Amino acid sequence: MLYLDTSAFLKLLVDEEHSSDLRAALAHATVWSSALLDVEAHRAARRLGLPADVVAEYLEAVTLIVLGDHTIASAREVRSDSLRTLDALHLASAMELGADLDAVVTYDRRLAQGCTAEGCKVFAPGRRDGWWSATTD
């Protein structure tokens, strides 16, 4: 299973660098994300002038994880001090998948660093492994 964060999801909606790589990688994947994705994606779509039905269509392919008490408690305890609130909630949601989690799909440097600190594999189609630890990319 792959966990998709908002930075990756938006690449599905808007053609930008690595969008085609991501679409190809997700073509036959089982994809999960936090219920946060619903709100974040719709808010971003409004800013970008994209119709809500486009977001809803892409969200249909994603199983959303409810933000329960356990997930919120886990988000408080993530190791990375630089991880912001919503990214900590994404990471905690991904960790809810346990051993079934193959990788967190993200193009967000802080989240990628937080994932590796927690022992989660990071996958960013089109980017080289370890891109998040480089000073330039």
Label each PLM-derived region with a short phrase.
Residues A8-F9, L37, T71, H90, ...:
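Alpha-helix capping/helix-boundary segments
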Residues S34, E96-D137:
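Acidic, PIN/NYN-like endoribonuclease modules and their adjacent C-terminal/linker elements
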Residues H28-V31, A61-T63, G98-A103:
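Short active-site oxyanion
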Residues V54-V55, T63-L64, D69, A73, ...:
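Alpha-helical scaffold domains
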Residues A61-D81, D87-S93:
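Acidic catalytic patch
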Residues S19, D38, A52-V55, I72, ...:
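A general structural signal for well-ordered alpha-helical segments in protein cores
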Residues M1-S33, A45-E57, G130-T135:
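Short, well-structured N-terminal submotif of metal-dependent ribonuclease cores
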Residues L4, S33, V66, T85-A88, ...:
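Short beta-strand scaffold positions
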